[in-house]
Every structure is written in structure tokens, then in C-alpha cells.
């Protein structure tokens, strides 16, 4: 059914466009078996590494066969409009600026859902796929968080900081907004999130109906992100793409973050299992907040006063249940999670914007306690940023799926 809907969307789009074009004006239409769109939101502190990744993509494109690699690039160059192009056989081809694709702005905000929608629709229209589509989200991410812990501004994916490459104080795109954009394009075979903290149950559940698989890290990733010379060919493997991306993410000699692959069709079952196990934990704990001591956490939001545990967030979902549920309940929940997390690679440490020995020495990563995904656990609102977080989580579908009696 998804394939039929995709074909209808493409044919309708092509019909509308052809009707609006002058008869003597030809559009570039290049079919591929798979089309992968790389959305580079680099108008921020990552601007300096965009060129390196583009060069890696060019090298990797020599091995992609009859497929389309399309890249949209927005970086902090005042003299350069954001542009979209196809990368083929080591070369950038068919390059167009945002003005050419209908975005009439001098300083384009790539975190604006309307901009992303326009870019993706252009890419699908000009580079349609015979088989399926993939999307790479390149940039910053703060998991499911929809507001900053220091100022009220939209967050979650992307960040557009104007022409400033020295900070990350601009606009972000929320995960619900991302979901709404992606629901307007053909169903995706996968989303590869090359950005920090993306593999949280909250975001995965929000995006469960727009892609078959989601690949990324529950933790921070290195500034350079994936090694695209090796990852680009993996993106186009017919059935083994997900595990290949995990295995080729960084060269063997580099520090690689923990990574995971989630099959989104299992997310409803994970939500159901989580609802059941949380209900039991709540009954046991009554009105107290759970002790998170020793549980894997993938970020700490405190940037001023050194390490304070009340600022930890993005706790490993399974490690939390190992600590706070009965062995039988945990085992039953894990069976549901294992059907969703179809691949994962562990790391005992990873690159971070914090001092590892200060912020992450309070837990030990092992194959047993690493589960590949994080989950929000409400904490005392008088501590850290949890007064805000405990309210923000209510904006997401995951919260209402696992807390059926708290729909306010």
C-alpha cells in the first residue's frame, strides 16, 4: 500500500509540474533504484566540517550503482545561497540554489518546516526512485527536547544560526514538525540520523509512520559525524544497509559512538510493553521519583557548574528497567524492545562536549546494560531542568501512549 501511495504522489507531482512549465523548458528528471537525500543543516557550529563530508560523499558516490544521491547544503557562507545537487561518480551535478527551487529568501532558515518540505518535494520530483527512499539528517540534535534548558527556543533537530558559525543559538525543528514534513513525501525506507541523541523512544515513536527503519545514536556523536566515503555505498545496499551503516560509521581506529537500528513497525508494541512495566513501577514507588544512580545516561544539560547528577538526561531505557523492575517484568519488556532494536553496536566511551571523566564516570557500559535507545524518566521538578522537562514531554505522542491516564 505504501508503494502505491508513493507512486501516486510522484505521478501527481510530475503532472502538476509539467502543466505549469513552458513547453520549451525541460526539467531534469533522473530515476534511480533508490534515492537518498542528505539534508545538511550546517548553518551553525558544524559549518566548518561540511566541506570535508561533501568530499567524502563524492568519493563514496563512485560505488552507488544505479541510484540517486541528492544533497541539500546550508552552511554559514554569506556569499553562498543554500544549494541542492546530485552527487554522481565523484562529481557534483545538476546543482541549483534555493532560489531555483522556489525558496525566495536571502537568508534561508533550513530549520523551517516549510523550507525542508520544499527541498524534499523538489528532490523527490527530480530524482524519483523506482524502489524506495532514504533520508540522512545531518546536523545537530537534542533528541526529543522541544525547548532549550537555558532559553525558550525551538529545538530537537537541525539548528539554523544565520551566518554565524560560532554558536548554536538559532532556530531548531521540533520532532513533531519533522514528522509532519516527512508525512508529505513518499514513505521512507530509512532515516539515518547523523546527529546527537536522536535514538530516544520519544522521537522514534513520533516518526514510526514515516520510515521503516531509523538509524542513529542515543549519545553524542563526533563533530565529523559519519565517514561518508564508506557510509555512502552502505546507504544503497538493498537489504543490508542498516547494519552496514553501523559497521562503517567510523574507521576502526576512531572512537565510535554507540549506535542502533530500530524497526519502527515494532514501536507500538514497545509502547504497550513500556506502559505495562511503568504501571508496575509506579505502584511500587507510589509518589516518589526513581533513584537514577549508576544508570547509563547519554547527556548532561549543565554547562555552568560542573557535574551535577540532577542535570543528567537521556537515560538508557533498558538500564532503567533493569534497576527498577522485577527480573520477569524486565525480561518481558526486553523481548518487545529486541524486536524493535534489530541492530546495535556498543561503545564504552564516546566523544562529548563535556569532560568524560567528570560527567560520565558514574556508570559502566556493558553489552548487558546497553540497549541502544534512551527514554525520558521524570525527576524531581525542583532539581536541574526537570520542572521544564516534565512538562515538555507531554507534547509528544509517546508520553500519552505510555501514560494513558495522564492526558492533560
Q: What are these language model-derived features?
A:
Residues 1, 14-36, 377-379:
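Bacterial Sec-dependent N-terminal signal peptides
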Residues 24-68, 72-75:
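Acidic/polar, low-complexity intrinsically disordered N-terminal segments immediately downstream
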Amino acid at each position: 500500500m505504501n508503494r502505491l501511495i508513493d507512486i501516486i504522489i510522484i505521478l501527481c507531482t510530475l503532472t502538476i509540474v509539467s502543466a505549469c512549465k513552458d513547453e520549451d523548458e525541460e526539467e531534469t528528471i533522473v530515476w534511480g533504484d533508490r534515492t537518498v537525500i542528505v539534508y545538511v543543516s550546517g548553518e551553525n557550529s558544524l559549518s566548518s566540517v561540511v566541506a570535508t563530508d561533501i568530499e567524502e560523499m563524492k568519493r563514496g558516490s563512485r560505488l552507488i550503482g544505479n541510484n540517486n544521491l541528492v544533497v541539500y547544503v546550508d552552511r554559514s557562507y554569506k556569499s553562498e545561497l543554500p544549494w541542492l545537487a546530485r552527487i554522481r561518480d565523484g562529481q557534483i551535478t545538476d546543482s541549483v540554489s534555493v532560489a531555483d527551487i522556489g525558496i525566495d529568501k536571502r537568508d534561508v532558515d533550513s530549520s523551517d518546516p516549510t523550507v525542508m518540505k520544499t527541498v524534499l518535494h523538489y528532490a523527490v520530483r527530480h530524482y524519483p526512485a523506482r524502489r524506495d527512499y532514504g533520508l540522512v539528517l545531518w546536523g545537530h540534535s537534542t533528541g526529543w527536547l522541544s525547548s532549550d534548558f537555558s532559553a525558550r527556543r525551538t529545538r530537537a533537530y537541525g539548528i539554523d544560526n544565520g551566518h554565524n558559525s560560532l554558536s548554536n543559538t538559532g532556530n531548531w525543528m521540533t520532532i513533531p514538525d519533522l514528522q509532519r514534513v516527512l508525512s508529505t513525501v513518499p514513505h521512507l525506507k530509512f532515516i539515518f540520523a547523523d546527529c546527537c541523541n536522536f535514538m530516544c523512544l520519544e522521537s522514534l515513536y513520533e516518526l514510526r509512520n514515516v520510515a521503516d527503519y531509523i538509524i542513529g545514536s542515543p549519545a553524542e556523536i563526533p563533530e565529523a559525524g559519519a565517514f561518508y566515503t564508506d557510509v555512502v555505498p552502505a546507504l544503497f545496499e538493498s537489504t543490508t544497509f542498516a547494519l552496514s551503516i553501523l559497521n562503517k560509521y567510523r574507521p576502526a581506529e576512531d572512537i565510535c559512538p554507540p549506535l542502533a537500528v530500530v524497526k519502527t513497525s515494532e514501536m507500538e508494541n514497545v509502547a504497550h510493553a513500556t506502559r505495562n512495566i511503568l504501571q508496575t513501577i509506579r505502584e511500587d514507588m507510589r509518589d516518589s521519583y526513581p533513584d537514577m544512580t549508576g544508570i547509563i545516561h547519554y547527556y548532561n544539560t549543565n554547562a555552568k557548574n560542573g557535574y551535577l547528577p540532577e542535570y543528567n538526561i537521556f537515560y538508557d531505557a533498558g538500564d532503567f528497567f533493569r534497576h527498577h523492575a522485577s527480573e520477569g517484568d524486565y525480561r518481558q519488556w526486553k523481548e518487545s524492545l529486541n524486536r524493535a532494536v534489530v541492530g546495535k553496536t556498543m561503545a564504552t566511551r564516546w566523544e562529548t562536549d563535556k569532560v568524560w571523566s567528570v560527567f560520565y564516570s558514574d556508570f559502566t557500559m556493558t553489552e548487558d546494560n546497553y540497549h541502544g535507545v534512551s527514554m525520558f524518566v521524570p525527576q524531581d521538578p525542583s532539581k536541574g531542568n526537570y520542572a521544564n522537562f516534565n512538562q515538555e514531554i507531554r507534547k509528544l505522542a509517546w508520553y500519552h501512549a505510555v501514560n494513558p491516564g495522564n492526558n492533560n
